[in-house]
Amino acid sequence: KNDKRDGQGTLIYSNGDKYVGDWANDQISGDGIYSYKNGDRYDGQWKNGFIHGKGTFSNSAGDVYIGEFKNNKMSGWGNYIYKNGNIYEGKWKNDKRDGQGTLSYINGDKYKGKWTKDKRIGDGTINFVNGSTYDGEWKNDYIDGYGTFNYSNGDIYEGEWKNEKKEGQGTFTYFDGDSYEGEWKSNIKNGIGAFSYINGDKYQGQWKNDKRDGTGVINYANGDKYDGHWKNDYIHGKGIFTSLAGGNYIGEWESDMKDGHGTFSYVNDDIYKGQWKNDKRGGTGVINYANGDRYDGNWKNGHIHGKGTFLNSAGDKYIGEWEKDIKEGQGKFIYSNGDR
């Protein structure tokens, strides 16, 4: 028309591409099909020589896009069916997923949320085929920021993330009722945190590599309390143990047992100060009894054992050998009046 292509027509390009469809004022405009030599194909609307409007684009790799275009770019709303079986439905901008959209993975996982320049960025929810779900913030296609992860086994984590790992402050509630609230690093408890056990025990203190490590306090459900050092999840180092029933221990520990030097004040007012081994008095130590008696010497497996001196409240003294709290072996007894 007026020496210009107008209406229906076919153009075969020198590079092997082919267009069949509408023309207006010498430009491709309207509805048409463009077949590329490399196997790509577009069927849809055109405007002033550009793919513009609604249409379907399929590439030689096997991917298919059905949706809106603007100036030769996927822009607006559209569905993208990937060769591998994944399907995206949502907003596009300049050939990239951008805005709200849903990606359904071939394995059954499904993400619904915000996209920016082809990456999950902002708020989004992913439902995993195994039953787990995450709802929260994303950055550069990774779980990153603040969000809640519901695990398929019933565990729940709510808190901060970085590069798909628990990092920063967060609360983990275990399916069995235990819970941890505190600091995380690379998916493990690390820093300061509080752990509440289903049995009623509560620990507050330092963590390292997912274990109680450093200084911390545990309040037991029965009213007992320990305040001191920990290592590899065990009471280890120096600390104070207080029993609700009465009595307390101040001293050294190893692997949850009194081990080293320490002082135990008993509920009956006896006081032992000395060495411990495997949670029992062992080595050398002194015990001052509430009735005024006193023993200073060797101990083994919690018993007076070996050599030692016993002084009773009356002033009588025994110096010699013992076996399991009984005077046994060589020894001498000195009475308060000087008799021997």
Can you name each region flagged by the protein language model?
Residues 24, 31, 50, 59, ...:
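Functionally constrained cores in energy, signaling, and assembly domains
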Residues 1-6, 18-29, 41-52, 64-75, ...:
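Conserved anchor residues at repeat-unit boundaries in beta-strand-based tandem repeats, strongest
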Residues 50, 69, 128, 142, ...:
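Aromatic (phenylalanine/tyrosine) cluster motif
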Residues 13, 28, 34, 57-59, ...:
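Intrinsically disordered, low-complexity segments enriched in Ser/Pro/Gly/Ala and basic residues
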